[in-house]
């Protein structure tokens, strides 16, 4: 019989498969509550960060699609991936953000989940603002 390789830490593991099916059922059963909340909180983070950057003359913008966000260090209009560049400021920003207890993966896409309630979202927004202030103190802005 043919063998199928499924690479990854838990790919194809029966327990992982049950957990995946269970969460998908939960998301479907609660979609009227979960997805609007995620979009609302993702938009809130992006809007507050963008307002902060605009009012503090910081050339950065938070782009989001619901609960997925990406901070771009440019004040210019972003039309394609070619408009996004990596900079030393970006590296320093994420180090400061980590120092304020917010972890963003190396690809610099931030995500929130339904577990991130408004008080946690407030802390995330505050950490972003403090990280921008840290950059300014360090002479990057």
Positions of PLM-derived features:
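Conserved N-terminal phosphate-binding loop of PLP-dependent enzymes in the Aspartate aminotransferase
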Residues: 1-141
């Amino acid at each position: 019989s043919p063998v199928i390789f499924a690479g990854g830490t838990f790919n194809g593991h029966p327990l992982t498969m049950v957990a995946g099916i269970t969460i998908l059922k939960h998301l479907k059963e609660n979609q009227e509550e979960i997805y609007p909340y995620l979009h609302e909180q993702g938009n809130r983070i992006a809007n507050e960060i963008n307002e902060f950057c605009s009012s503090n003359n910081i050339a950065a913008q938070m782009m989001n699609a619901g609960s997925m966000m990406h901070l771009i260090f440019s004040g210019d209009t972003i039309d394609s991936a070619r408009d996004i560049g990596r900079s030393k400021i970006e590296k320093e920003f994420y180090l400061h953000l980590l120092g304020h207890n917010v972890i963003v993966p190396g690809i610099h896409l931030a995500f929130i989940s339904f577990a991130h309630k408004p008080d946690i979202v407030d802390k995330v927004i505050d950490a972003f603002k403090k990280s921008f202030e840290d950059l300014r103190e360090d002479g990057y802005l």
